[in-house]
Amino acid sequence: MHNTDVVIIGAGPVGLFAVFQAGMLGMKCHVIDAQEVIGGQCITLYPEKPIYDIPAYPKIVAEELIKQLALQAAPFNPIYHLNQQAIELNKQDDFFEIKTSKNTLIKSKVIIIAAGAGSFGPNKPPLANIEDFESKSVFYFINDKSKFAGKNIVIAGGGDSAVDWAISLSDIANKIYLVHRRDKFTAAPESVRQLRHIAETDKIELITGYQLNALDGNNSELQSVIVKDLQNNTRKLDANILLPFFGLKQDLGSLANWGLNVKLHHIEVDSSYYQTNIEGIYAIGDIAHYVGKLKLILTGFAEAASSLHHAYSRVFDGKALHFEYSTTKNTGKRSKSVTK
């Protein structure tokens, strides 16, 4: 049995920042994540994706963001339990006991759920024989964008991933077709502005009012993508690569059975300290829902800070927290509060 102050479920960017925030408050952390490495979707799905809304970084790729967050958390010696899921929760007096899928047992006073989308997988378009092209011509995630240099690429979708990747790949691709069923994109307004500016050149062509209809190729190598509009008019796009970005399937797994208020794959929390309906359990980042929620990494960072400041009195048995700015703290100090 491991004893600690805080268990953080999820080692994505918000979970890693929660480690830092806990450490600054003198709390020891154990972190559980289902992936083999820390970083969550930023590493597993899109390590080379540029992120534009992190303060002080005009642009930072996801992999570098995770590297910096891990370095920031490192002085507080978090214990990572990777490649395993939190499957059982038992409450005993003022403590929680968590059991993982590898039978790891951890006892803590506070739980921070920063599990993002939970277990995730891509929403695939319903195209005949799409599996024949997957991993060679059809990709749902981008781990190495250099493989797309000089290619003719069809990107399908209208959200942040579709728009951001169209912009990012336009520097190296021969041609990009961005297919969306509407003329209006749901990505960040500045990203949409950049997209439309690039589309004035021949690097990106916006195919709006159309949806994917069929794939054509041989031996797993794509030759063209057929798209169709609402009037059933079709158009053939010469392409080597298809990148469908239609979001992720979400599965909370065992978390859904913990007695938390769950709605549409999200955990309901209060909007002040992001505590769930179970005292001592908080949810932050994309998995948390409250009125006015913004699904941004920086929002998750703020939620991490607020939730852990609120959890302080629980960890330290009612002791009041005297707020300090980070410039007055020793970031190398170690926690002395670990649960006995």
From Swiss-Prot:
Instruction: Tell me its cofactors.
Output: FAD
| Highest taxon listed in the record's lineage | Bacteria
Under InterPro entries, the record lists: FAD/NAD-bd_sf, FAD/NAD-binding_dom, Fd--NADP_Rdtase_type_2, Ferredoxin-NADP_redctase_2
Reaction catalyzed: 2 reduced [2Fe-2S]-[ferredoxin] + NADP(+) + H(+) = 2 oxidized [2Fe-2S]-[ferredoxin] + NADPH
**Gene3D superfamilies in the cross-refs:** FAD/NAD(P)-binding domain
Task: Give the family per the record.
Answer: Belongs to the ferredoxin--NADP reductase type 2 family.
Q: Keyword annotations for this protein? A: FAD, Flavoprotein, NADP, Oxidoreductase
Q: How does it assemble?
A: Homodimer.
Residues at which FAD binds: 33, 41, 46, 86, 120, 286, 327
Q: State the EC number(s).
A: 1.18.1.2
The note on cofactor binding and number reads:
Binds 1 FAD per subunit.
Q: Which GO terms describe its molecular function?
A: ferredoxin-NADP+ reductase activity; flavin adenine dinucleotide binding; NADP binding
Q: What is this protein's name?
A: Ferredoxin--NADP reductase
